[in-house]
């Protein structure tokens, strides 16, 4: 079974572009426009990855990631943002997460997502 990804990105063209790219390589992707839209989707074990923009209206990606981790401690998080430095210096603790700065190539995104799932598989093998 392919891992499922929840994508939260407020830019419509970017959201559709990322969703299509990840679906093309075989991932199941549900896409929403903001953090508050993502919340009803979050349930334990439903998604293996939250892929979220940091700067979004209503609820930003960091807050969304914190809520997602409370609902499902196993979920992995990757932030996509044009504000990587700002986000990391904001002093708010984000769950252990990967960061991908815009602009990026689709192959970089796919490679990072693949790597997250490879790491997760390795972790699972070593868990008692």
Predicted feature descriptions by range:
Residues 40, 62-74:
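Short amphipathic alpha-helix used as the core "switch/output" element in two-component signaling
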Residues 31-40, 61:
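Helix N-cap/capping motif at the beta->alpha junctions
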Residues 56:
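Receiver (REC) domain active-site loop signature in two-component systems and cognate sites
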Residues 8-9, 32, 50:
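Conserved sequence signature across two-component system core domains
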Residues 11-30, 97:
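Two-component/phosphorelay signaling modules centered on CheY-like receiver
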Residues 53:
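Active-site residues of response regulator receiver
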Residues 104-115, 121:
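C-terminal output helix
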């Amino acid at each position: 079974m392919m891992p499922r990804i929840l994508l939260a990105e407020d830019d419509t063209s970017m959201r559709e572009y990322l969703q299509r790219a990840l679906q093309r390589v075989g991932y199941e992707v549900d896409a929403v426009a903001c953090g508050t839209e993502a919340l009803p989707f979050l349930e334990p074990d439903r998604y293996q990855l939250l892929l979220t923009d940091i700067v979004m209206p209503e609820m930003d990606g960091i807050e969304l990631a914190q809520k997602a981790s409370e609902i499902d401690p196993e979920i992995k998080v990757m932030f996509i943002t044009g504000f990587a430095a700002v986000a990391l210096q904001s002093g708010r603790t984000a769950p252990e997460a990967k960061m991908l700065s815009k602009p990026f190539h689709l192959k970089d995104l796919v490679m990072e997502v693949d790597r997250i799932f490879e790491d997760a598989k390795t972790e699972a093998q070593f868990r008692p």
